[in-house]
């Protein structure tokens, strides 16, 4: 049980910006909302089905047709995304399919949302960053991730800025190139990207139409030492932009699963998922995504995900999935953020900004005092994908997760764990080198502690190989 007094949080999750997760009803046999709950959030005209291995293609087609479905799309081995005919409800189709012997499982196509928050302020559009160390407390402050020393560590290892490691950002897209109505963010290098894909528009141009994905990618690999803007933690890593969320920051589980498999097949070493499903979505509701996450682990790809912003003592999926790094959010004061989920399965925390949670006995927490600063990065200053700056501070576990993804990229580049560390080795290293917070006794609030990029990339220590 969490030690947090949730009745005295400074700001409820409902006050987060529109990309905060919606509440979703749990499924029993069919997608029916629980009494008093918000209706389930899933695609209204499509479902995901997995057939048993021995089922013949003709039999699969007949089963789908009998359920009122058509236009099957292959998403994974033996798995199909089915479009429902007009007048056929998701519940009716699922009832028919779940009674068939050739169907392993059938589920709605649940939607996830970006796990970030935006608090408007009057900073003004397009203003210069000034001294990055004054603004980026999350990198160099007392409760930052110790970026300067981490940069020195990996430079000494011949891999400055995590050079060469590919990090896939599965999000709203990234402002990675200038073409048509889109413009590359002025604080991204044109050489900092590898080929991505847009699973919303179904083309090879994963442009951002929201700003959330550009922010996340900037925390990982913003151009650094270029006399402009801010810095990126793994500034020489390559970003693979994969668009799985639409302009509202929403995307279905099947789309996210496709994005995960794409990233694995195209050379990503780390995948960042700054998104969350509603707290009511369970593992049984998103089997295709869990299979994709297992596919990533089996191919040696580390997946990092946001723990969620509902101030609940439960980690949201996909962060809750096995072997996924679940990242909570901490504040500038070294306290758990008031919106951050916590509980069993939390791996560690990273800077997410905002106000302190009300944690009795934690000397770093002052829920009644001034809120800590938010996290800053260069992204859109409005709705136009051509205007950039630091429009306001973002806060959320979305902002926390890329700190961990970037640290993992630095570990890989440093070679401290060998040439190709496994996800399990990377997770063990991240946990073993984290800074203890809150007294260090109860992992339900902070996991192993605050991610420390310097300690994680230093020579020697847990799991290090002889040089």
Cite the ranges covered by each PLM segment.
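N-terminal secretory signal peptides that target proteins for export/translocation
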Residues: 1-14
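Bacterial N-terminal signal peptides
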Residues: 18-30
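Primarily auto-inhibitory N-terminal propeptides
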Residues: 34-131
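Generic structural signal for small/hydrophobic residues in well-ordered secondary structure
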Residues: 49, 82, 103-106, 150, ...
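Protease zymogen maturation seam
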Residues: 77, 98-166, 174-187, 197, ...
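Subtilisin-like serine protease catalytic core
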Residues: 149-195, 202-253, 266-269, 320-323, ...
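Extracellular S/T/G-rich loop segment that most often corresponds to the catalytic His/Ser-adjacent loop
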Residues: 171, 301, 319-413, 454-455
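C-terminal subdomain of the subtilisin-like protease fold in secreted/lumenal serine endopeptidases
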Residues: 264-278, 287, 292, 299-301, ...
């Amino acid at each position: 049980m969490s030690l947090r007094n949730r009745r005295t949080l400074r700001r409820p999750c409902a006050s987060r910006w529109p990309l905060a997760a919606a509440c979703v009803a749990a499924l029993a046999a069919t997608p029916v909302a629980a009494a008093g709950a918000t209706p389930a959030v899933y695609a209204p005209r499509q479902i995901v089905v997995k057939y048993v291995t021995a089922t013949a293609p003709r039999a699969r087609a007949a089963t789908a047709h009998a359920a009122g479905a058509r236009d099957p799309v292959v998403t994974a081995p033996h798995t199909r995304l089915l479009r429902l005919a007009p007048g056929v409800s998701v519940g009716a189709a699922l009832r028919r399919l779940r009674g068939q012997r050739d169907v392993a499982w059938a589920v709605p196509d649940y939607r996830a949302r970006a796990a970030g928050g935006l608090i408007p302020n009057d900073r003004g559009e397009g203003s210069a960053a000034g001294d990055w160390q004054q603004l980026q407390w999350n990198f160099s402050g007392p409760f930052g991730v110790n970026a300067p020393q981490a940069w020195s560590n990996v430079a000494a290892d011949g891999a400055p800025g995590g050079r060469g490691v590919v990090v896939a950002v599965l999000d709203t897209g990234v402002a990675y190139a200038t073409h048509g109505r889109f413009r590359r963010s002025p604080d991204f290098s044109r050489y900092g990207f590898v080929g991505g894909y847009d699973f919303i528009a179904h083309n090879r141009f994963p442009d951002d139409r929201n700003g959330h994905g550009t922010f996340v990618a900037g925390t990982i690999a913003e151009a650094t030492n270029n006399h402009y803007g801010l810095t990126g933690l793994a500034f020489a890593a390559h970003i693979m932009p994969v668009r799985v969320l639409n302009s509202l920051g929403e995307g279905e589980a099947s789309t996210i699963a496709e994005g995960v498999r794409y990233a694995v097949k195209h050379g990503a070493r780390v995948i960042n998922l700054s998104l969350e499903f509603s707290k009511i979505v369970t593992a049984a509701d998103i089997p295709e995504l869990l299979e994709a996450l297992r596919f990533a682990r089996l191919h040696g790809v580390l997946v990092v995900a946001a723990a969620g912003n509902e101030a609940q003592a439960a980690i949201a999926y996909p962060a809750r999935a096995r072997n996924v790094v679940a990242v909570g959010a901490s504040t500038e004061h070294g306290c758990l953020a008031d919106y951050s989920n916590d509980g069993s399965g939390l791996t560690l925390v990273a800077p997410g900004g905002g106000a302190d949670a009300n944690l009795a006995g934690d000397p770093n927490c002052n829920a009644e005092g001034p809120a800590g600063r938010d996290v800053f990065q260069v992204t859109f200053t409005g709705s136009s994908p051509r205007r950039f700056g630091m429009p306001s501070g973002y806060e959320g576990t979305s902002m926390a997760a890329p700190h961990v993804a970037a640290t993992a990229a630095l570990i890989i580049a440093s070679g401290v764990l060998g040439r190709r560390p496994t996800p399990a080795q990377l997770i063990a290293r991240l946990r073993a080198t984290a800074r203890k917070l809150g007294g260090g006794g109860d992992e339900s609030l902070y996991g192993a502690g605050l991610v420390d990029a310097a300690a994680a990339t230093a020579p020697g220590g847990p799991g290090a190989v002889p040089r």
